[in-house]
């Protein structure tokens, strides 16, 4: 069904695509996606009504392309959600785990990652007994790894970022206290997620990481992510002129 939807969209047959997309959302059993698809259908119906009445709208072509782009996004997200819900394996397990117990927010994870270096330094200074110090340091590393793994997982299986998610992710990227290796792991998760489901906000994040971060490991990881996404999601990128412009600007400085 997903392939049929994409074929309809490629041929600019939005009405047929939306009918199939509604059925796909039913399989995914996700009320939020169903609501967004219904809203898209309503907007498209109004646009058709105004056109049938002969009403002039200089923004109609722009609106149509926005609707088309949104339909592609919803199709990708719905199919990914359906696979997570009905599939097997690690990602299926994580999807259900996060449905039962919501993960920490990006802001909460940022605070934990920032505290790691400080707590590690304090343990080295304040715990005099070597055995106790080793035990304390080991616990800190285990706790830190738990948060890094959670960060990787919530990004990897996310179908899209909200503005709030992007803001939280940028907090981690911009923090002077979060270790560069942690940010590099985060960027790897963003790249894997983008290869599966294109997300304009995640791609913006990669471009920002490449343009602004001071650590080589982060910049190189972001550049790899940009290149892989541009290759695997070439067709989706063409729907976003602003991202193409930002990408071209980034490539000038390579």
Question: Where are these predicted regions, by residue range?
Answer:
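Extended, helix-rich scaffolding/adaptor regions
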Residues: 1-129, 142-143
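Alpha-helical repeat scaffolds
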Residues: 204-205, 237-250
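Alpha-helical linker/edge segments of TPR/alpha-solenoid repeat scaffolds
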Residues: 48-54, 231-240
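Short inter-helical turns and helix N-cap capping residues of alpha-solenoid HEAT/ARM repeat scaffolds
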Residues: 214-215
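Alpha-helical solenoid scaffolds in large eukaryotic transport, assembly, and signaling factors
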Residues: 116-183, 187-208, 234-235
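Conserved small/polar residues in nucleotide/adenosyl-binding loops
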Residues: 253-254
């Amino acid at each position: 069904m997903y392939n049929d939807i994409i074929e309809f969209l490629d041929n600019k047959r939005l009405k047929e695509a939306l009918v199939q997309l509604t059925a796909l959302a039913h399989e995914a059993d996700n009320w939020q996606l169903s609501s967004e698809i219904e809203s898209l259908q309503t907007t498209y119906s109004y646009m058709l009504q105004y056109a049938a009445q002969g009403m002039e709208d200089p923004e109609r072509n722009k609106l149509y392309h926005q609707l088309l782009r949104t339909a592609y996004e919803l199709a990708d997200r719905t199919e990914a959600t359906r696979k997570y819900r009905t599939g097997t394996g690690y990602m299926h397990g994580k999807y259900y785990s996060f449905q039962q117990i919501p993960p920490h927010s990006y802001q909460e994870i940022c605070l934990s990652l920032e505290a790691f270096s400080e707590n590690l330094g304090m343990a080295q200074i304040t715990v005099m007994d070597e055995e106790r110090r080793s035990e304390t340091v080991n616990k800190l590393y285990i706790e830190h790894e738990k948060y890094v793994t959670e960060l990787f997982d919530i990004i990897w299986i996310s179908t899209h970022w909200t503005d709030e998610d992007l803001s939280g992710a940028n907090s981690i990227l911009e923090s002077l206290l979060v270790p560069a290796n942690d940010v590099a792991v985060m960027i790897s998760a963003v790249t894997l997620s983008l290869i599966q489901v294109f997300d304009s906000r995640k791609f913006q994040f990669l471009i920002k990481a490449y343009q602004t971060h001071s650590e080589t490991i982060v910049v190189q990881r972001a550049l790899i992510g940009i290149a892989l996404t541009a290759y695997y999601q070439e067709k989706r990128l063409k729907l976003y002129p602003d991202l193409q412009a930002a990408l071209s600007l980034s490539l000038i400085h390579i």
